[in-house]
Structure formats: C-alpha cells, structure tokens
Amino acid sequence: MKNLFLFALCTFSVSSFALTPRIETASNSDSFISFRTANDAIYCSGDIPGLTPKVECVTTIKGKPILPRPKDCEFEWGELFSVGATGKASLVCASDTPAVPDSQILKDDETIKGKGWQCTASGDSLTCSNQEKHGFKISQAKQKLF
C-alpha cells in the first residue's frame, strides 16, 4: 500500500508539473529577453542592458491607434507598447521596433517575467503588467492601457 501511495504521489507531482505554464525570469543585470506570441502577431523585448528595466511589444494593429499621434511624433505610432517596472504603460513613438525574428515563443497561458514586469499570452492577445498593476493588453484587433 505504501508503494502504491508513493507511486500515486510521484505521478500526481509529475503531471502537475507538466500542466504548469512555463515561467521564465530575468535573473541578472545583463539579461535581455525577447519573445513573441505563438501566432507571430506580437513581438517583445525586455530588460535591454544599459536601459531602464521595461518590456516593449509591437503588433500590427487593425484600425486606428487607441491614442492620437502626438504632434512631435515623426515615426511609427500606435503599434509599440511599453511598461516599466514602475509607472504607467504607454504607447511609444519609435523608428525601431523590438521584433527579434528568432525570439522564443510564448505559448498560450504561459508567463514570462522580467525585472519588475511580466507578460502572459492568452489566445491572440498578450497582457503585460508591472508591480503597480499598470500595463497593457494587446492584440491586432484590440489594444488597451491600464
């Protein structure tokens, strides 16, 4: 009976581990994280060495940007979202995007963590937030800052 209990416990532990979404963490100051959603619609980069810890994600939106283009923005607008370890999320006026073609794939219901932020894939969308609960939820069809 004792052996059966241990077998059942080990089987449960292994199956529970297999069902747990992968969580990765940036652990040192030189960590650079790049990832994309499984449908290749959203690309992100985070914790770039030498810059303030943050994650930036880009997607091609369908429709108008959620915020009007600032008058001083001469580059791309409405498709690049950013959130740092603290503070509010924002749209970024940028001439360059964080798209890294060979970045790791963040599968549905998986979460990746950086320095003070985390992102979770869900269906065709991605939600990224910081410790203060500020962030963004984006897909090609809808975008939201919170």
Q: What residue spans do the PLM features occupy?
A:
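Acidic, glycine-rich flexible loop segments
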Residues: 93-131
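Extracellular glycan-recognition/adhesion modules and their associated mucin-like linkers
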Residues: 29-41, 110-118
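A low-complexity, Ser/Thr/Gly/Pro-enriched, surface-exposed linker/loop concept
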Residues: 19-26, 54-106, 138-146
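N-terminal signal peptide c-region/cleavage motif recognized by signal peptidases
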Residues: 13-15
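Positively charged n-region of N-terminal signal peptides that target proteins for export
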Residues: 1-4
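C-terminal or internal capping secondary-structure element at the end of a domain, subdomain, or sheet
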Residues: 123-146
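Short, well-ordered strand-loop elements centered on a beta-strand within folded domains, enriched
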Residues: 49-63, 123-130
